[in-house]
Regions:
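Basic, Lys/Arg-enriched alpha-helical interface segments
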Residues: 1-64, 73-77, 86-105
């Protein structure tokens, strides 16, 4: 898989040094495995993955952070969308598609 916006991801986690090693592990998982489906990612990532309105949300470092990406398994591309703390993540109404799209861009 190829990650689009890796530079933006690294910028987003800069204020959170405690998350950096977890992000590096996540990146190695997607880089080293040419996965084509979400089940592979779930199996390799302790099943701490959710899908909401086309976004894939990974729990990072337990439940302290959320890494939000869009995955196109056909083209094998992952697009970084947002990196949120648990507090930021909890403020979003995940049942409201319009709010999710607005908050995540």
């Amino acid at each position: 898989m190829r990650l689009i916006s890796k530079k933006n991801l690294l910028s987003a986690i800069e204020p959170y040094p405690d998350a950096q090693s977890a992000i590096e592990s996540w990146y190695q998982l997607i880089k080293d495995n040419d996965c084509q489906w979400l089940e592979f990612v779930r199996n390799g990532y302790s099943r701490s993955v959710e899908q909401v309105y086309g976004y894939t949300i990974f729990n990072i470092k337990g439940n302290q952070y959320r890494l939000i990406v869009q995955i196109n398994s056909r083209t094998r591309i992952i697009i970084f969308t947002k990196f949120l703390t648990e507090a930021e993540y909890s403020k979003i109404n995940w049942n409201d598609r319009d709010e999710v799209k607005q908050k995540l861009g």
